[in-house]
A protein has these predicted regions:
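C-terminal structural segments of small proteins and small subunits
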Residues: 54-83
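Short, charged/polar N-terminal "headpieces" of proteins
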Residues: 1-19
Length: 83
């Protein structure tokens, strides 16, 4: 699963092979793993601590267009971390 970015111990990845809708990203934080919808950055599966969920959403919302483009074209592009 290609890594897009990482920040505060959270790794953001996108998986292109055999993916299924809705378009989403994977967030991994320690032993926790969750899927977030690219459209609205809502957690659609998995579990993350509440603080990590907020950080993923804060990071992902400004990059929704870039993430959707990656999903559509299956071309990975590294994105800057949350600061």
């Amino acid at each position: 699963m290609p890594e897009i970015t990482r920040f505060y111990g959270i790794v953001i990845k996108i998986f292109f092979q055999n993916e299924h809708n809705p378009p989403h990203i994977h967030a991994i934080y320690g032993e926790h793993n969750a899927l977030f919808s690219i459209k609205d950055m809502q957690m659609i599966e998995g579990d993350l601590p509440a603080r990590a969920v907020k950080l993923v959403q804060e990071w992902g919302r400004p990059f929704a267009k870039e993430l959707q483009q990656m999903w559509d074209t299956k071309e990975l592009k590294k994105l800057p971390p949350l600061k």
